[in-house]
């Protein structure tokens, strides 16, 4: 079984992505509830649940004599995206995110223990974004309508024989790829390559600089859907504005909200001002859509769907949420701890994980 290449350390500069847009939900950068349903449904995790929050920590394997001699595992997993409650249906840009339970000293050994197998294999690589977290991204988008198996063979890491291997399965669904043209004020949504809908929109109007960044501009770049909520509370508290008498104050309940960054950007239903949709940019940074368009978009959205925004002067930082497609493939591979930095995924085996692996309901 071929293993995929994995990731070298890249320091995550929190300050670089801390500047939010005025659409920020509740003034935080907590990802919205995860999209776990099939395309066309609206199945959600609880609103307070961040992607990957339910991943279980690993426990020692009790059945093995080698494990008993080795003692407790030196390295386990604290969190995995996708979550393990069910087989999640995701978009073609979906990343696999692994957070270990402690800082990883030998990143190359840990990375070599991570395997990705797909029914329709594509080249991919891991990139370290902190001393505990590593992210897998493919060179090109996943091929739609297939199953993927991720396995962390932690027991194969030297000195970590007591650890239990972990696997997760997910399904890549319809290829939902949207392009938001902020100059023409329209979002075109393609599903499996065919134009499915053209939605009039209104993007960020600009005009509010903070620390050299116009936070009222929508960020240009390749975003991914990170989650969605039927109704999202959006406030001005991220600006430090909490007084209702302040002209910059707002607190709005926004329907059909699909989150596309960690700086508070969403595609959502416009809260009034419908006369601007398709004509001018008037939002605080989010992509406002018609009620019918926003509801439809919410319904088809899967975590990992691609939403590319064009036409603004504010560039999307690759460290902002799941904006990993902002890096070129060569840039991405340089984050691997392994020399080659990439390999083709192996075909997914038809058999279920072996008895020594913990499938974590996934």
Which residues does each PLM region occupy?
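Short, solvent-exposed cationic patches
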Residues: 215-232
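Second-shell loop/turn segments in exported
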Residues: 84-87, 136-139, 212, 244, ...
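Residue-level detector of high-confidence beta-strand sites
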Residues: 198-200, 222
